[in-house]
Amino acid sequence: MKTSNLKKNYWLMKSEPETWSWEQQKKKKTEHWDGVRNYQAAKYMKQMKIGDQCLFYSSVKEKAIKGIMRISKEYYPDHTDKKKIFGMVDVTYIKDLKEVYLSEIKADPFFDDFPLVKQARLSVMPVSLKQWQKLIKMSEKNERV
């Protein structure tokens, strides 16, 4: 049985609402995060450990962080990958956040080196502890629900 790691890591995972929305994640609670076909994103997913926390980012129209999930199952083969190259992880809903929009993140020089700003097309990326803390504070300051 795998146990949670001592050092928690933080991640951001993007989804297009037409494919998988935050509302669907909340309703389902735990779901596999499949369909990732980028080698860098897959490399990050292989580093994820049970208990790591993830920001759910809704891309395309909203472009906003919507909530927090945790890794509940580590990397394993993705059943949607016919070539059997890529894998997936399971994520579990933790809580909603007041939205933090990409425009707010880009406007803050603190995030100049944040992968969401520098590598905009990457769908899975690490978040440093300081970035995580700042994003959570930004959410707490926002008045949107």
Q: What is each model feature region?
A:
Residues M1-K49, E140, V145:
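Compositionally biased, charged N-terminal/linker segments
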Residues Q24, V100-I105, I136-M138:
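Short, charged, solvent-exposed linker or helix-capping segments at domain edges/interfaces
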Residues K66-M125:
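Aromatic- and Lys/Arg-enriched surface recognition patch
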Residues E18-W20, K98, K134:
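Short, acidic Gly/Pro/Ser/Thr-rich loop/turn segments
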